[in-house]
């Protein structure tokens, strides 16, 4: 009788474990140039300056069945900003704005993911930028997941937010340039 009870318990535990889906860990695919952090800011209220950060890295965990358990962490080297104009890049990197010599890194670490639709979520986390940490929420869209041609698995997302520069101790260059829009595209390779 004890053997039958133990066998039933073992089978039940195995079946329950098999039914549980665990969040998978992904490395953001920077090497393959399948991930970007782009930004834009108003120029005098007449047009927009667009740019990107070239040096950054990150990871995320993703569970399609339980998106609220997902997490993301990103580290950006602020000196890697690029706006297709070398003199402007130097000025943005200077003490006048980002002061990249003093604040070499910007970091985002998620604290909560709230599903807002079938393929959308609000991703809230702590953004550390210019030596200040503040909560920020990104509007994220799940693009898809599946196998790649090289035998791996991938998942992809887009996320957008607007950041007020004054919140991070950065004085914008004018009244129309107090906010910066961030547009992030992430494709991650599932880790084994």
From Swiss-Prot:
Belongs to the UPF0312 family. Type 1 subfamily. This is UPF0312 protein PFLU_5725. SUPFAM superfamilies: YceI-like. Keywords: Periplasm, Signal. Residues 1-23 form the signal peptide. InterPro entries: Lipid/polyisoprenoid-bd_YceI (IPR007372), TTHA0802/YceI-like_sf (IPR036761), UPF0312/YceI (IPR023480). Its main location: periplasm. HAMAP family: UPF0312. GO terms for cellular component: periplasmic space. It is found in: Periplasm.
């Amino acid at each position: 009788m004890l053997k039958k009870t133990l066998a039933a318990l073992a089978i039940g535990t195995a079946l329950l474990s098999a039914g549980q889906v665990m969040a998978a860990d992904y490395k953001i695919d920077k090497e393959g140039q399948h991930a970007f952090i782009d930004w834009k800011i108003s120029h005098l209220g007449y047009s927009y300056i667009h740019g990107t950060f070239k040096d950054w890295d990150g990871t995320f965990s993703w569970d399609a069945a339980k998106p609220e358990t997902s997490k993301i962490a990103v580290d950006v080297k602020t000196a890697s900003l690029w706006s297709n104009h070398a003199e402007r890049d130097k000025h943005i990197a200077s003490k006048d704005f980002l002061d990249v010599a003093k604040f070499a890194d910007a970091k985002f670490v998620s604290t909560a993911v709230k599903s807002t639709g079938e393929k959308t979520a609000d991703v809230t986390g702590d953004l550390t930028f210019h030596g200040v940490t503040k909560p920020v929420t990104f509007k994220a869209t799940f693009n898809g997941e599946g196998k790649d041609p090289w035998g791996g698995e991938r998942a992809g997302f887009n996320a957008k937010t607007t950041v007020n520069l004054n919140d991070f101790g950065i004085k914008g260059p004018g009244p129309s340039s107090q906010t910066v829009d961030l547009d992030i595209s992430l494709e991650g390779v599932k880790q084994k």
